[in-house]
Regions:
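Conserved PLP-enzyme active-site core in the AAT-like
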Residues: 2-35, 39, 47-56, 62, ...
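Conserved small-domain helix->loop->beta segment predominantly found in fold-type I
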Residues: 292-301, 307-370, 374-401, 437-446
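PLP-dependent enzyme catalytic core of the Aspartate aminotransferase-like
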Residues: 311, 375, 387-459
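C-terminal, active-site-flanking charged/polar segments
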Residues: 22, 367-372, 427-429
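Short beta-strand-to-loop capping motifs
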Residues: 271, 349-352, 409-411
């Protein structure tokens, strides 16, 4: 369309009231939750940008599809519809449903990853890293240098450093690298895309070494759209065809359908290796359910199948990426430091730059995230040293490479006025960022501590 205003390419037929907790209620909620935003009740949040995973709105087609869900324990019609869509999209012949992406990771890594292994990735996200490390392996991040600099405007900051991959293979040895993973888009690094050229280069290195190559494909459609916009030779290609080419370069994928499956729950593991698939299915039956439902209801399988078809619609993707850019542009123009360019699913605020007076060991990104909620009821999530610091044997921590706050935008859920409100809150908090103070952890779990840790302010 010739007009500059972004419009949502859908009409809204059903609404849900938003809670509007006051400042006193929000302060009480923070105290009760130990200043961990995961501990807030949903009705204590005004705008919830904690995650885009499973929090979006489904379409009328998806809701209609749920009405014909087949709940048969074995051989459900809904599974075969789901299987057909996944096979058409990915080209992988073995499709294993799971209740969400981390279940696919756990099953795959339990079979394929051993103690002492090294698993290279552009950047592991939290559950991927934890599932690798739970097997006693090293989750090694080898994103390009530009991907670690929030201010660099590189078109594909999610790219894997191919030279570093080759060096890792040389250093570690082929026998200790069970697979190479590329996450599209790169969630931990700002929602940044990976180019087709980079995927081809990674594939060539893996093929030469005989190492399986997997995609963490949660946001494959958003990545495909960035390729269409930014990579030579793809401007006239349909996003679905670009996505198919991405999958064709890999030996398998894990997928959370709660992102680019446009569903509220679900995921899958898809591979070409029949022997690997058989082992994975045996473990699936033990922990998730039978092979034709994998812990999902039939109506969930229907919703995912339809979502995987809708997500590559060009009008949807144009709206999706531009609406994220809209928030990024508003706050950046006001001088708020962000990861540039904007990611596909989220805007990432650079807390280290916004609050340089807070030492990294006092978690500046956690401080910023808390203040966004305290000030305006906006819930984001810390993507920094709370989530990704490496705890060392002497009790100290190796900080994360970046201190970010992610504002993840649920799909087809909020309108432009909601995002305008978020921008106002961010700009106001940023204007007073010199008043932010640090936090210390007073309680934490061994794995994925950011979900349940409790904090106290450092005064």
């Amino acid at each position: 369309m010739p007009y500059r205003t972004i419009i949502e390419p859908f009409r809204i037929h059903s609404t849900e009231a938003i809670a509007l907790p006051g400042a006193e209620q929000r302060e009480e909620a923070l105290l009760r939750a130990g200043y961990n935003l995961f501990g807030l009740h949903a009705d204590e949040v005004i705008i919830d940008l904690l995650t885009d995973s499973g929090t979006g709105a489904m379409s009328s087609r998806q809701w209609a599809g749920m009405m014909v869900g087949d709940e048969s324990y074995a051989g459900s019609r809904s599974f075969y519809r789901f299987q057909s869509v996944v096979e058409e999209l990915t080209g992988f012949g073995e499709v294993i449903p799971t209740h969400q992406g981390r279940a696919a990771e756990r099953i795959l890594f339990s079979i394929a990853v051993s103690d002492g292994d090294v698993v290279p990735n552009n950047t592991h996200f939290d559950t991927t890293r934890a599932n690798v490390e739970y097997q006693g392996a090293e989750a090694r991040d080898i994103v390009i240098a530009e991907g670690l600099d929030p201010d660099v405007a590189h078109p594909f900051k999610g790219n894997m450093d191919v030279a570093a991959l080759e060096a890792t293979i040389e250093e570690v040895g082929i026998d200790r690298i069970p697979m190479v993973i590329v996450t599209v888009t790169n969630n931990s690094g700002g929602g940044q895309p990976v180019s087709m050229e980079n995927l081809r280069a990674v594939k060539e290195v893996c093929a030469a070494a005989g190492i399986p190559f997997f995609l963490d494909a949660c946001r494959f459609a958003e990545n495909a759209w960035f390729i269409k916009l930014r990579e030579d030779g793809y401007a006239d290609a349909h996003p679905r065809d670009i996505a198919k080419e991405m999958f064709s370069l890999a030996d398998g994928c894990t997928m959370s359908a709660k992102k680019d499956g446009l569903a509220n729950i679900g995921g899958f593991l898809a591979v070409n290796d029949k022997a690997l698939a058989e082992e994975c299915r045996n473990l699936l039956i033990l922990t998730e359910g039978f092979t034709t439902y994998g812990g999902l209801a039939g109506y969930d399988l229907e919703a995912i199948a339809i979502g995987l078809q809708e997500v590559t619609d060009p009008e949807y993707l144009r709206y999706r990426i531009r609406s994220t850019e809209y928030l990024a542009d508003k706050v950046a123009k006001a001088g708020v430091p962000i990861v540039s360019p904007a990611g596909g699913h989220a805007v990432y605020l650079n807390a280290a730059k916004l609050a340089p007076h807070i030492p990294v060991e006092q978690y500046p990104a956690q401080s910023l995230a808390v203040e966004l909620y305290r000030n305006g009821g906006v819930r984001g999530v810390e993507i920094g040293s709370v989530m990704f610091a490496k705890r060392l044997e002497d009790g100290t921590e190796q900080p994360a490479p970046m201190e970010l706050v992610r504002l993840a935008i649920p799909r087809r859920t909020y309108t432009q006025s909601h995002i305008d409100y978020v921008a106002e809150v961010v700009i106001d908090v940023a204007a007073n960022s010199d008043k932010l103070h640090g936090y210390q952890i007073v309680e934490q779990a061994q794995w994925l501590r950011h979900f349940t840790a409790r904090f106290e302010p450092v005064t």
